[in-house]
Curated annotation (Swiss-Prot):
Zn(2+) 1 binds at H68, D101, E164. Pathway: Amino-acid biosynthesis; L-lysine biosynthesis via DAP pathway; LL-2,6-diaminopimelate from (S)-tetrahydrodipicolinate (succinylase route): step 3/3. Its cofactor is Zn(2+); Co(2+). The active site is at D70, E135 (proton acceptor). The keyword Metal-binding applies. Binds 2 Zn(2+) or Co(2+) ions per subunit. This is Succinyl-diaminopimelate desuccinylase. GO terms for biological process: diaminopimelate biosynthetic process; L-arginine biosynthetic process; lysine biosynthetic process via diaminopimelate. Homodimer. It catalyses: N-succinyl-(2S,6S)-2,6-diaminopimelate + H2O = (2S,6S)-2,6-diaminopimelate + succinate.
Length: 376
């Protein structure tokens, strides 16, 4: 049975074992399809990360597609029903690491471009792709560096469509028009190490920090708003002790905020410090801001995505800001409108990752219709 161009390309991409930060030739394959359409490609390598900025056209407005070729590790391959880098279509599903996150989306957008350019050779504006091999990892040498490069030469994106797997039950039923911020805290609480039989000669760091952690876990941070759910606080790691007969003199605690626009990173940091200080702790605290929250309100890009989904599938879509962070956090501050639209996310990062094969063809049609809405 012959496969659609989208599915053939998705399989070719999945065969390339591009575990972060290895691109494994994916971007070269993509560029081989884009160049005949009139795209010029620029390879931007930072550290061990390969990035591609491909563009067709010199004028605005610019519709960019952002995505990543890297995938998360597979874990023991013996746990997979099918080899993760030997894609197979079985019972209507395309199986393989990256099928949903996000090589299926990459293939869908490229084939959408092929059809759009064939039907609209004199389209207005420009089409661009920002592709990285460092999204699933530290994300330090990927999209953020490309954005910095583009800004330094005053090259702007008006709209950015990110191919992250946003859908829940049916392709296109959810699009992300924003994301919460992510703030990490790394807390070290100091006590005095000693023998468990002589606690009066020691100071248990775990006992000291426990009431403060309880207070942080019970703290009401905010109510959320019309666009974002309430801010959440989660303790992600607690480490202490070097032996069963030793009072721990130090306790390490890692925690994370997923926060909405009712708070800022700075306001959360201040409130955490105030709670810790109320408990008279001896501590060190370091912060890492992974990304600030962003929101794309209803406008040209959101409307184009909604109209495209309605035209292709006949269904209305839900706007959502739930889920984890994405590279949209690096693009939104440039002023570009940003939405995420991709396949169903039920199996992402899991053993036996898969996506319904026909969904990738549907997604390609939606992407093509977005191009029509904005640039035809």
């Amino acid at each position: 049975m012959s496969l659609s161009p989208t599915l053939e390309l998705a399989k070719d991409l999945i065969r390339r074992q591009s575990v972060t930060p290895d691109d494994a030739g994916c971007q070269e394959l993509m560029m081989s399809r884009l160049a005949p359409l009139g795209f010029s490609g620029e390879n931007l390598r930072f550290g061990e990360t390969d990035n591609l900025w491909a563009r067709k056209g010199n004028n605005g407005p610019v519709l960019a597609f952002a995505g990543h070729t890297d995938v998360v590790p597979t874990g023991p391959e013996k746990n997979w029903a099918h080899p993760p880098f030997d894609p197979i279509i079985k019972d209507g599903y395309l199986h393989g690491r990256g099928a949903a996150d996000m090589k299926g989306s990459l293939a869908a957008f490229i084939t959408a471009c092929e059809r759009f350019v064939a039907n609209h050779p004199n389209h207005r504006g420009s089409i661009a792709l920002l592709i990285t091999s460092d999204e699933e990892g530290p994300a330090q040498d990927g999209t953020v560096k490309v954005v910095e490069t583009l800004e330094a030469r005053n090259e702007k994106m008006d709209w950015c469509l990110i191919g992250e797997p946003s859908s829940t039950h049916q392709v296109g039923d959810v699009i992300k028009n924003g994301r919460r911020g992510s703030l990490h805290g790394y807390l070290t609480v100091r006590g005095v190490q000693g023998h468990v039989a002589y606690p009066h000669l020691a100071e248990n760091a775990v006992h000291n920090v426990a009431p403060a952690l309880d207070a942080l876990a019970k703290e009401f941070w905010d109510n959320g708003n019309d666009f974002f759910p309430p801010t959440t606080f989660q303790i992600t790691r607690v480490e202490a002790g070097v032996g069963s007969n030793i009072v721990p003199g130090e306790c390490l605690v890692h925690f994370n905020f997923r926060y909405c626009t009712e708070n800022t990173a700075e306001s959360l940091e201040e409130r955490v410090v105030a709670i810790l200080d109320r408990h008279n702790l001896k501590y060190d605290l370091q912060w890492h801001l992974s990304g600030r929250p962003f929101l794309t309100d209803k406008g040209a890009l959101v409307s184009a995505a909604q109209n495209a989904i309605r035209t292709v599938t006949g269904r209305e879509t839900e706007l959502s800001t739930s889920g984890g962070t994405s590279d949209g956090r690096f693009i939104a501050p440039t002023g570009a409108q940003v939405v995420e639209l991709g396949p169903i996310n039920a199996t992402i990062h899991k053993v036996d990752e898969c996506v319904k094969a026909e969904d990738l063809d549907t997604l390609s049609e939606i992407y093509e219709q977005i191009l029509v809405e904005l640039l035809a």
